[in-house]
């Protein structure tokens, strides 16, 4: 068993919280281990002047960390699973996904208690085409404007009056000790979450057997299988965190229900599909096929080329 481990993570407060969460879990299992957290800046952290969907490329929030992992500058990478592309680099694998936090999106406003109360032309901040599409489907009178930066930056922009409301992941606010900033939690029927939202993934080198064995007990089997189904759907669609694609898998007794969504960014066309099954990969492929049959591939291609 190794006596030390280096965890690579983004430098944002939320990413560091996630790495500390993994570190604490490891130390509960191995109290004598030295676990170092190494922070680094990713392309997604630097390129803040353009919407995510306009930046191109995949893995905007993970590539530099995965590079460090491949170059053996760190032993483990910790990610928010919604940032991890459907296909991973050769030689790397997600070896554990921890128990999931709240999967829902949070409506945050200093003025309005619910999105239903937002008036014509109200400005809502979000960096996500997925959130934009689902908001505009229900509330076409809103102005959904791009909002980038870490959680504190986004909240500050709201508090400075640049937006009437913003949409954030509930998990991030709760993990940062800011549940009081949540004005209203959006039901998944209103805002289906991103693939892997609320789940922390731990990545290691495929050939590093000892580290993989060390991390395996941190996995939550139910979460891991649900995220696997969501990512299976996303892989077939060729989606990533920049695209208007959503999915959520949940166990219902011995079977899993997977719901999937693909939408045009303006919310005028929103495709839904769902299926039940016990094989996460097959389930994801089935839901993806149902979405493709409705025209999902064309929507995704149009967004990529926009």
From Swiss-Prot:
Co-factor remark: Binds 1 dipyrromethane group covalently.
GO MF annotation terms: hydroxymethylbilane synthase activity
Q: Which residues carry this modification: S-(dipyrrolylmethanemethyl)cysteine?
A: 241
The record's section on Pfam families has: Porphobil_deam, Porphobil_deamC
Q: What class of enzyme is it?
A: transferase
- Recorded catalytic activity of this chain's protein: 4 porphobilinogen + H2O = hydroxymethylbilane + 4 NH4(+)
Pull one GO CC term from this UniProt entry.
Answer: cytoplasm
EC number annotated for this UniProt entry:
2.5.1.61
Question: What InterPro entries does the record tag this protein with?
Answer: HemC, Porphobilin_deaminase_N, Porphobilinogen_deaminase_C, Porphobilinogen_deaminase_C_sf
GO biological process: what's one of them? protoporphyrinogen IX biosynthetic process
Q: Which domain of life is it from?
A: Bacteria
| Cofactor field | dipyrromethane
* Key word Repressor present: no
- Asked if the keyword Transferase belongs to this entry, the reply reads yes
In this entry, which stretches build a coiled coil? Answer: none
Keywords from the UniProt entry: Porphyrin biosynthesis, Transferase
According to its UniProt record, in which pathway does this protein act? Porphyrin-containing compound metabolism; protoporphyrin-IX biosynthesis; coproporphyrinogen-III from 5-aminolevulinate: step 2/4
Q: What does this protein do?
A: Tetrapolymerization of the monopyrrole PBG into the hydroxymethylbilane pre-uroporphyrinogen in several discrete steps.
Tell me what else is known.
The porphobilinogen subunits are added to the dipyrromethane group.
Subunit info here reads: Monomer.
Family according to the record: Belongs to the HMBS family.
Protein name according to UniProt = Porphobilinogen deaminase
Q: Which species is this record about?
A: Acidithiobacillus ferrooxidans (strain ATCC 23270 / DSM 14882 / CIP 104768 / NCIMB 8455) (Ferrobacillus ferrooxidans (strain ATCC 23270))
Q: What is the lineage of its organism?
A: Bacteria, Pseudomonadati, Pseudomonadota, Acidithiobacillia, Acidithiobacillales
